Amino acid sequence: VITGTTTTQSPQFDVDIREIRKHYDRLSIFYRLLWGEHIHHGYWENGEAIGRAQIRLMEKLAEKARIPCGATVLDIGCGLGGSVLWLAEEYDCRVTGLTISPVQAQMASRRARRKGLNNRVRFLVEDANAWLPQSETVDAIWIMESSEHFRDKPNFFERCTTALKPGGVLAICAWLRGKRSADAKGAKLVETIGRAMLSASLDTLDQYVDWIRQAGLIVATAEDITANVAPTWEYCSRMAQRWPMPWLTPLADRPTRQFLRSFPLMNEAYATGAMAFGLFVARKPSRVG
């Protein structure tokens, strides 16, 4: 269901970009140990294992976006490069991954070399909030759970439009503010999670649709897939209780402790409707004539 048209403005969380960089520099090894090759939600249909569910989410987004084989792709907020390498392997894409973290870029580049993909992928250290499109446009922009960190999303989507070729596609998976986020308890829960997860803001499905349309793109898909991805945080909460995590957590700094303790809150936010998870696909109009 594609909706939109909202005048509500989500609260902004006071997040320092330097803290986001420090977070990923410090915790990327932990992410790799906890989540595996892909540091994003899974998509469950039939009780899949976590690794298969994470691949299924990428498959779902790529299928909806109709990513063509051999496409040039820009992955903004690429993390450890899981999607970059998967797109190169499965679709023979040439992919550039942007990450704010030098540590993530180094880890991703090493993985690309081990897989023999360094001739088709590259990783650049760049803050998406300051990213500017280059003269060479791309077939697709891929954003897997990173837009939560972007301060000015309307402006960001305008830059995406500039970076896409005519007929190019924008493919996004994003954490969202849910329908029950307006009441006091839901709002507090969203704020606690947003700050712990270093989000600039958490916004609604309607806001994403409106901003993408205002940027000049045609929205093809805007789907709430919360029910399929929610088991992610049950898995993460269980992993956080396994040795040595209960012993290590008290030794961590305050932001890391807040991050780890937000795992069960994500379960609550999805269960109560305070938060949701969206999948979006939009296309740049083809050139006329």
Each model region followed by its residue ranges:
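Class I SAM-dependent methyltransferase SAM/SAH-binding core
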Residues: 74, 83-130
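Conserved alpha-helix/loop element of class I SAM-dependent methyltransferases that forms part
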Residues: 37-38, 48-69
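A short acidic, Gly/Pro-enriched loop at the edge of an enzyme's catalytic core
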Residues: 129-141
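Short alpha-helix
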Residues: 200-222
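N-terminal auxiliary segments of SAM/dcSAM-dependent transferases
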Residues: 1-33
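Conserved Class I S-adenosyl-L-methionine
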Residues: 221-289
